[in-house]
């Protein structure tokens, strides 16, 4: 929004305000909270004989809300401190786990890569226009995953204090590469080489859980649950900063922190809506 209002001039300020209004409503923790709860139910509670329920999800939601409140009410410094400590270690742990799965199914790696290419550019897909739809869906998922081109990441990177802005720019460029090209690609490959995509009706996080359980029976699902918890939680606290900056731009930095109250409340509301 500052690039629009300062770089393009005040006459474009309505566009900057529209961006902030959209960001205010889009920067919500509902998806991440649901994924954390879904992973907990799939990995911990259902194997123990406890089915998912509204009351159980609300209890987990309250715990998540409390942890989120502790972090986001501490400001950008506390958010950055948590993210800097947790994310690199979790990325490394996740990549090591996926690497072990790929080594176990090493003979299926090349056939899986060939399958990806063949299905993407098959004659039937081209004639049916499916390639365009797949590319569009991939672009949407990539933008949701790494925020490339959306305009939100500059809020976080712009808040850093560094003597070398170029280095911060390089860090910003590495984000999409690590997130989408490395983590997401290896996750998809992990699902393919284990074969769970053929034998299971699950999707999303549940399908990834089955891939980990199949190859790493004792630790796989718990490693994945821990990684999902950390990734989801750090994303939740990061999104809160975006929403706060958007509200601050509209009504002033003095009142922007009120966004935090709405943000932590929407976690419980979102978990309640999925049971309606």
Residue spans of the language-model regions?
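Transmembrane-helix boundary/entry motifs in multi-pass membrane transporters
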Residues: 1-26, 208-224, 248-255
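Helix-loop-helix module between adjacent transmembrane segments
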Residues: 5-34, 38-71, 226-236, 269
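Membrane-interface alpha-helices at helix entry/exit sites of multi-pass transporters
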Residues: 6, 10-18, 51-52, 162-177, ...
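C-terminal membrane-solvent junction of multi-pass transporters and transport-like membrane proteins
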Residues: 8-12, 225-228, 232-270
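Helix-loop junctions at the membrane interface of multi-pass solute transporters
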Residues: 71, 142-147, 151-165, 172-176
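Helix-loop-helix hairpins and the membrane-proximal interhelical loops
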Residues: 78-139
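Extracellular/periplasmic helix-exit of transmembrane alpha-helices
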Residues: 97-115, 158-162, 174, 178-205
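Conserved small/polar residues in nucleotide/adenosyl-binding loops
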Residues: 275-276
């Amino acid at each position: 929004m500052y690039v629009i209002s300062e770089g393009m001039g005040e006459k474009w300020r309505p566009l900057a305000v529209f961006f902030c209004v959209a960001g205010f409503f889009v920067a919500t923790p509902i998806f991440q909270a649901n994924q954390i709860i879904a992973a907990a139910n799939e990995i911990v509670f259902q194997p123990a004989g406890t089915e998912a329920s509204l009351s159980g999800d609300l209890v987990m939601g309250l715990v998540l809300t409390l942890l989120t409140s502790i972090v986001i009410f501490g400001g950008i410094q506390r958010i950055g401190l948590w993210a800097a400590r947790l994310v690199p270690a979790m990325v490394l742990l996740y990549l090591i786990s996926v690497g072990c799965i790929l080594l176990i199914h090493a003979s299926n790696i090349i056939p899986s890569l060939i399958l990806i290419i063949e299905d993407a550019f098959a004659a039937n897909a081209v004639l049916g226009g499916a390639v365009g739809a797949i590319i569009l869906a991939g672009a949407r998922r990539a933008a949701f995953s790494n925020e490339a081109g959306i305009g939100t990441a500059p809020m976080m990177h712009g808040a850093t204090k560094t003597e070398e802005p170029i280095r911060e720019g390089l860090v910003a460029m590495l984000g999409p590469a690590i997130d989408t090209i490395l983590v997401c690609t290896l996750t998809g490959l992990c699902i393919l080489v284990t074969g769970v995509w053929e034998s299971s009706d699950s999707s999303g996080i549940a399908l990834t859980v089955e891939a980990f359980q199949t190859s790493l029976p004792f630790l796989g699902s718990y490693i994945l649950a821990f990684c999902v918890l950390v990734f989801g939680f750090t994303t939740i606290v990061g999104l809160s900063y975006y929403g706060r900056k958007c509200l601050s731009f509209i009504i002033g930095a003095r009142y922007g922190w009120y966004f935090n109250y709405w943000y932590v409340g929407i976690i419980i509301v979102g978990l309640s809506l999925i049971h309606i």
